[in-house]
Design a protein with these regions (language model features):
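Juxtamembrane membrane-water interface segments that cap and precede transmembrane helices
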Residues: 189-201, 298-322, 423-447
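Core alpha-helical transmembrane segments of integral membrane proteins
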Residues: 193-308, 318-337
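Membrane-interfacial entry segments at the cytosolic side of transmembrane helices
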Residues: 272-281, 339-342, 382-394, 471
Length: 539
């Protein structure tokens, strides 16, 4: 008995250390390799083209990067120019002018010769004049003066070499807190060529990668293999490995997501045979993503499940958010069964910090989804009354709001600033934007969204009917509610549905082996009364 208690206390301590470590990762820090220039005004020059020779020449004199000219699936010369001069964005699904007045007045020059001799200048390309274009091309940008040399580093993208168009105006005005900095590079042009190929290849495979993962996890679940319970962590680990290896070959990417995930899932299933091992696997994968988002955000961002690099550049996108629901919710179930209420609360807090904090996931929609799912899960696991569910939901909301306000208090870009910095009006405007950003695109893509929705419902019903394990049903219910909320608050329905198929298939084979600990503290106000067995009178 003493050995069991000591082991339990060590695992509780490990959960506490995990939460503390993630909180430390989320604390503001300074990247010593990045160099911030002194404030100074720059001349901004828009060229109609920039040849390879001119780009190589300016790279020897300054710092260079690749620039995304807009936000959303489409762009144009007019919208890119409007965002350039204002240093503000507007999603192409919404349209119209970005907020604010023009801050800079760029010069327009034909040819790229100006880049070879200018001083104190920012030279960049924009999309060609004409109609609307797909926002799938990166354009060259260079800065000369004030010691700039190497790769441009953007506070908006968090990816060395990748620049957003909203970074140009604050840089030109000499605002170091929101402008571009740089990091040294021996072959900046070669690095940018590789970066562009990597972004292009991974963006082409966003749907394919999720469909492959969903099919693989469904197959493992249908075959009744325990590897289904470790397949989502395996897919997330392979995805992160492909990002760290900076793979740009599409054949290798597909092979990694399919064959690599299957092999790793079977290997993890052999190693993680106990609930404690699964708990450490689920928590370890999430912690690894958190550490990567702080130390090497480009590894987590540029991979098959990463953001699309045309509206969200870093943090947790809808694909990874949906896949993370499996280890976060299943881990919360195991933490509750192993350590009771304390374990559930610590693991839930750990997940909310990773999902919400601005230096980590910075995913407001994901925070809402996870908070609601955790409240439903706790309500079911602890057999609470409705008041208990409301209490858990309120606790999750307070935690998320505290993390959001903590991020808003720091300088620099924040994915959640537009929704929360404007008070009630800003939040209402964010809710109103769900129609053009979420629901209208889903209606336009109904031929893809409708079949995925039908498959997800069928998989969920089959999983629910095939299991009689109460913990699995509790997990399925929380996951189903979370996916429903995700469709309401997020803006990529097809990604969420495909990812949902994958995680429901995995959760269907999740069966805890250890008996849950008994709760020593009872709160009658929140807990449902246990049924009392009646005794029949002796005959």
């Amino acid at each position: 008995m003493g050995e069991v208690l000591a082991r339990s206390s060590r695992l509780v301590l490990l959960l506490g250390v995990l939460v503390a470590a993630v909180s430390a990762l989320a604390a503001p820090g300074v990247a010593s390799a990045r160099v911030t220039p002194l404030p100074a005004p720059y001349r901004v020059v828009v060229v109609d083209r920039m040849s390879d020779a001119a780009f190589a020449a300016v790279a020897r004199r300054g710092a260079v990067g690749l620039m995304r000219p807009g936000f959303g699936p489409t762009t144009s010369y007019g919208s890119a120019l409007a965002e350039l001069v204002r240093g503000a964005e507007v999603n192409s699904h919404i349209g119209g002018m970005p907020p604010g007045k023009p801050l800079i007045g760029p010069d327009k020059v034909r040819g790229s010769w100006v880049a070879t001799w200018c001083r104190m200048c920012i030279v960049l390309q924009l999309p060609p004049r004409g109609g609307t274009l797909l926002n799938d091309k990166l354009y060259r940008v260079a800065i000369v003066g004030r010691g700039y040399h190497g790769l441009l580093v953007s506070p908006t993208t968090h990816i060395p070499g990748l620049v957003s168009i909203v970074d140009i105006a604050p840089t030109a005005l000499g605002r170091p807190s929101t402008g571009l900095s740089w990091v040294g590079a021996s072959n900046a042009v070669g690095h940018l060529d590789s970066l562009g190929q990597q972004i292009h290849a991974n963006n082409r495979l966003k749907y394919a990668a999720l469909f492959i993962a969903a099919a693989l996890l469904l197959l493992l679940a249908l075959l009744g293999l325990r590897a289904a319970a470790t397949a989502v962590p395996a897919a997330l680990l392979v995805n992160l490995g492909l990002g760290a290896a900076q793979v740009s070959n599409e054949i290798v990417l597909v092979a990694g997501i399919s064959i690599g995930t299957a092999l790793l899932a079977f290997a993890l299933a052999r190693v993680c045979r106990s609930d404690d091992a699964l708990l450490m696997l689920y928590g370890g994968v999430v912690f690894l993503y958190a550490a990567t988002m702080v130390s090497r955000p480009e590894w987590q961002a540029i991979n098959p499940f990463g953001p699309t690099q045309n509206s969200r550049f870093w943090g947790i996108g809808n694909q990874v958010e949906t896949l993370l629901l499996a280890p976060l919710l299943a881990g919360a179930v195991l933490a509750r069964r192993r350590f009771g209420l304390l374990g559930f609360l610590l693991f839930g807090l750990f997940g909310l910090v990773v999902m919400t904090d601005n230096r980590l996931g910075s995913d407001g929609g994901g925070a809402i989804v996870l908070g609601v799912a955790l409240a439903v899960l706790g309500w079911r696991l602890f057999r609470l009354r409705l008041s208990g569910f409301i209490g858990l939901l309120g606790a999750a909301a307070v935690t998320v709001l505290w993390l959001v306000q903590r991020g808003l208090a720091q300088q620099g870009p924040d994915h959640l600033r537009s929704a929360f910095s404007g008070g009630v009006s800003g939040f209402l405007a964010s809710l109103a934007s769900r129609w053009p950003l979420s629901y209208l695109p889903a209606l336009h893509a109904w031929m893809l969204v409708a079949p995925l929705l039908l498959v997800l419902v069928a998989v969920f019903v089959a999983a629910w009917r095939r299991t009689e394990v109460q913990a699995t049903r509790d997990l399925l219910l929380a996951l189903g509610v979370g996916l429903g909320v995700s469709l309401l608050v997020n803006d990529s329905a097809a990604y969420e549905l495909a990812g949902g198929i994958a995680v429901v298939g995995a959760v269907a084979r999740f069966v805890p082996t250890a008996a849950p600990v008994r709760l020593r503290v009872r709160v009658p106000l929140f807990r449902r009364a246990e049924p009392v067995a009646s005794e029949s009178p002796p005959s």
